[in-house]
Amino acid sequence: MLPRIHAAEFLGEPQYGGGRPVPPQEVWEKLQPYASTRLPTSITHSEERIWRDYAGLSDYPHYDAYRVTAPSADLWSKYDRWDGKTIRWGAPLETIGDMCRSLRELNRPMPCAYWSQGPHCGWEVYGGRKRTSPTPEEIRLQAYHALSTRITSLYWFNLSLKSLVSFRDLIGPITRVDREIRLMENLLLEGDAYEYRRELQAGRPSWDLASVTGPIGALLFANDLTYVPDPGEKVFKFAPRDGAFVFKLPAYLSRPAEVFRLDADGPHDVKFSAGAGRVTIQDRVHVAGIYVVAPTEGLRQRMQARQAELLRFEQSFEFDPAARDSDFEKLRQLLP
């Protein structure tokens, strides 16, 4: 049983504390009895402005900060990301990465995690936006801004039955992200954040590039920043883009044996060139691109086998409410 316990958390969000913030000293006193046990402790942070005061108190810090149609500690109308136009129904999705990096650096060497925004039937209408959960693209980019910082666990808020039935179009995208995480997990767990760079085009955000490197290889991420708020639908819109991404490589990866793109369908060929401690990847990206660099041959084959194994496991349930109407109807009938 013990290896299956992720962490002990009983304080919720101490920065809010049900209306009364719990002081850091009091948080430490409540967590201290666990110091002599094998159970790691966890705290859900919620406000970047003061989470430095809680740094180092728990074994597994994480946070929640949803970027569309949800309560938030930051004032969305103050962001001037899009030519000075402000919106009240969402915030720049890349602020997820900003906050993950902040939490990571404040709490080193502790591993960090993130509550990623998923379907939820309890959020209200914000700023006139009718859709009260993220779109599939909004879900994917929020998750990958977090993953690219080398979080070691991602939690979805929330996967209640009512929420999944209310937003059926999110079941498939979440399943794909989950499968990709399982493909990447060893690289994330054994590696560390290596490089982060934001690229601008004509002075505007263009790409967030990040890498995680470790003994068996590197993960490279290219997150698209040219999405725009649609004034009618009040959702963020994306389009596929061509890009050439330059990533620095540590010495042991300077002559990679394998470079490939990765997604839920497994490894794919990608155009690249390597030299002078860098790799340049040319690809067409929709929302987020994931790439793998390996110092020796064999990782691609292992990932292909792992993808097939994960797919067989998913299919073994013979239940696919995302793709089959009959299965979705069975899911819907479970509602009270």
Can you say where each PLM-predicted feature lies in the sequence?
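C-terminal beta-strand-rich structural cap/linker in extracellular carbohydrate-active enzymes
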Residues: G275-E318
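Histidine-centered catalytic/metal-binding microenvironments
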Residues: E318-P336
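Intrinsic-disorder-associated interaction segments
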Residues: W89, F167-L170, I174-V177, T296, ...
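Glycan-processing catalytic domains of CAZymes
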Residues: M1-A257, D265-V293
